[in-house]
Amino acid sequence: MAYVKEHAPSEVYHLTKKENLNSILEDGRIRRFGDTECWFCIDLQKMKAYMEQTVMCEGKPYYSVTGQLCRYPKFVPGDYVLLKLTPCRQEDNWYRWEQEIPAGSPAELVRAAHEFSLLKIGYRGDLAFHNAEAIDVPRFLTEGVTQGEPVHTSTELWDTLSRRIEDEMADYMHRLDLRTRDELIQTADEIDAMMTCDCELRLLGECLPREELVFLLEQDRPLEQMSKAWMEHRNVDLGETFQSLLTGLYAGQQHNMDMKM
């Protein structure tokens, strides 16, 4: 096989199992996982043609990254998600894999191999991305749906949350300035809880699990929500216990949602 240098695309499409989506968004990267490159298609027409010649061909043989002969399993569209991604950096690191065909091969085989090689493009390394959209695969295949739902990486979620926290804390400090000395003394525990939660959230940052970042962004005043819970549990230690408190709040919300269904 031979590699051909390609211009950096402005956006790419990547097919993956739904079960991988959360970890991909937490990571903010498409990983190579043992390969030299991670692979994409530059438009949906190429992606559909690529799928029709690979994952949609049940029983078709292929070689894995390790060189092992495998066969494609039964294709279940609902198990997959199609990601539209914008690469973070326009690096000169893109290649097309041109499949080599033995000399003397029929012209039809040579043409088919070349056309297949044009379907995908590889990024040499792990691709960091932003502005992701998740396209529903069943609807893409049956209805031609090309518009996806925006999905956010942990870094993007934390950037939004940190701005929310900063604004909320600034508003809180302004309101503290309006309190009398006696009111400040009476609300010392509340003030301590707000300061503690602000500090702990900033220390944890984007290391928080993605679902907990989403949970906090769903709250009108995330710092106030956390500080109230912290005051109820103020006898616990800092650090990991703060994380446990947040995890407990998230789990409680999920339990309440499950009970309503």
What do these predicted ranges mean?
Residues M1-W39, E52-V55:
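ADP-ribose/NAD+-binding catalytic cleft of ART/PARP-like enzymes
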Residues H14, Q254-M261:
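Non-Sec secretion/translocation targeting segments of pathogen effectors
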Residues K18, I42-L44, L85-P87:
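Residues immediately flanking
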Residues E19-T36, E91-A107, E240, S244:
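Surface-exposed flexible segments
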Residues T36-I42, Y80, A188-D192, T196:
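Short, well-structured alpha-helical interface segments that form or flank functional binding sites
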Residues L44-Y62:
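Short active-site loop/helix that positions an aromatic residue
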Residues C57-T160:
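Active-site and NAD+-binding cores of ADP-ribose-processing enzymes
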Residues W158, S162-H255:
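Protein-protein interaction and targeting regions used for scaffolding, dimerization, and localization
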